[in-house]
Structure formats: structure tokens, C-alpha cells
Amino acid sequence: MNPLIQSLTEGQLRSDIPEFRAGDTVRVHAKVVEGTRERIQIFEGVVISRKGQGISEMYTVRKISGGIGVERTFPIHTPRVDKIEVVRYGKVRRAKLYYLRALQGKAARIKEIRR
């Protein structure tokens, strides 16, 4: 990688990101701007994928809200996310959990790991 690009991206990387992967349940505190006000909106769900590397790394969180599946994709190093909390560590055997989109109720549960 070009040293100039590398030096620019190192300044943008966040160091307060907890370790998490697909299958973990996370609580994302996202900053939302509404007009002139800014507030924090909490989005809690299961991480179904994590892709990319470096400054462009992203993760997708899925939750069920009102019986409808909602997915949001966040960049890991964005300043729009105030903090990420890991609520529960899940035990899965895949890196991408897109099959959860077709499952409902108890079938969509993920086994928990005690850490």
C-alpha cells in the first residue's frame, strides 16, 4: 500500500472497538441527526456478516422488530457509531449467517458461548 494512503488511514482507525464476529449479539449506539438535533439510537441484534479490512471494514446486524427482520450495515471505524457493546457471544460454524433470513422464531436462535 502507498505510504501516504497508509498514514492517512491509520489516523482514521478507531482503537475502542471490541472483538466480535458473526453470531455475536451486539448493541450499536449510532448517532442520528434529526434537523439540528443529534441523538443516539441503539440498534441491538445479531451480527450476520463482517467483511472488508482496514478502514473499509463493515459489519451487518440483524434484528426482528415488530415481526419484520431489519438489517443495518455499519462501517467499523465510522465516527457515526458512538460505541459497540457485545451483549452475548454466539457459537456458529459459518462466517456469513445469511441463512438466518429464512428462519423464524426458535429456529433462528444461536447457541451462546460463555467467555
UniProtKB/Swiss-Prot annotation:
UniProt xrefs under Gene3D superfamilies? 2.30.30.790
Where does the record locate the signal sequence feature?
Answer: none
One Pfam family this sequence matches? Ribosomal_L19
User: Is the keyword Ribonucleoprotein in the record?
Assistant: yes
SUPFAM superfamilies assigned to the protein according to its UniProt record, in alphabetical order: Translation proteins SH3-like domain (SSF50104)
* Top-level taxon of the source organism: Bacteria
The record's keywords, sorted A to Z, are: Ribonucleoprotein, Ribosomal protein
MF terms per GO, please? structural constituent of ribosome
Keyword Ribosomal protein belongs to the record = yes
Q: Which GO annotations describe the biological process of this protein?
A: translation
InterPro entries hit by this protein: Ribosomal_bL19, Ribosomal_bL19_CS, Ribosomal_bL19_sf, Translation_prot_SH3-like_sf
> Where are its TM segments located?
none
Recorded GO CC terms = cytosolic large ribosomal subunit
State what this protein does: This protein is located at the 30S-50S ribosomal subunit interface and may play a role in the structure and function of the aminoacyl-tRNA binding site.
Which PANTHER family does the record match to this protein? LARGE RIBOSOMAL SUBUNIT PROTEIN BL19M, RIBOSOMAL PROTEIN L19
Similarity section: Belongs to the bacterial ribosomal protein bL19 family.
Q: Which NCBIfam families match?
A: rplS_bact
This protein is called what? Large ribosomal subunit protein bL19
Q: Give the organism the record lists.
A: Streptococcus uberis (strain ATCC BAA-854 / 0140J)
In the UniProt record, the gene name given for this protein reads: rplS
